[in-house]
């Protein structure tokens, strides 16, 4: 049976070998089955540049490259790995997609994105997001010394954690009006995203739906879509049969 897999928010790092092993196992078990694998951002906990890839990321690139020889891999940047560039993508066999991407998924018009752009009530974050996406800002950052880039990334992560602790639940979730606007603009019947770490299948008006792929902190989360079914799965680490 044909099917496509979607994952996101793995937040891979050397500090969590259990997540790394679970994702490696997931790739190995499903390599010969799915039509395509879409990674919807935040594959890594942090990414400060293709030239500073850690050993675990280089090993993952080799695994992804092998996977891509028979199954296409598509990647949309998240808020943690928005600096992942063409060099690492090529090394991994991944195709970089724009931050909002429309596809025909077995006859169903769908729109894919990481999801942070939908959290429009978080004004401070949206201001930072606009700044960090500017070409000149990326250019300057990428030309800083490696030590400076790492220091900036560490400071931003720390500030983000502190800020999120005091933000309300609603501010950190997507805004319904932003969802409706994007669905209307793209003509999509289905929206698929991550970012919020709140996996669910939301039934919307006019027979549309919004699917949120979960994170991989305590267990895996995989969305499996075939011509006949939509299945959002939780995968306990060590059990990765999608």
Swiss-Prot record:
Molecular function terms from GO: manganese ion binding; UDP-2,3-diacylglucosamine hydrolase activity
Metal-binding among keywords: yes
Highest taxon listed in the record's lineage: Bacteria
Cofactor: Mn(2+)
Pathway terms, separated by semicolons: Glycolipid biosynthesis; lipid IV(A) biosynthesis; lipid IV(A) from (3R)-3-hydroxytetradecanoyl-[acyl-carrier-protein] and UDP-N-acetyl-alpha-D-glucosamine: step 4/6
GO CC aspect terms: cytoplasm; extrinsic component of plasma membrane
Subcellular location: Cell inner membrane
Residues engaged in binding Mn(2+) 2: 42, 79, 114, 195
GO process terms (BP): lipid A biosynthetic process
Membrane topology (UniProt): Peripheral membrane protein
Record-linked InterPro entries: Calcineurin-like_PHP_ApaH (IPR004843), LpxH-like (IPR043461), Metallo-depent_PP-like (IPR029052), UDP-diacylglucosamine_Hdrlase (IPR010138)
Protein name: UDP-2,3-diacylglucosamine hydrolase
Organism (species): Shewanella loihica (strain ATCC BAA-1088 / PV-4)
Encoding gene (name): lpxH
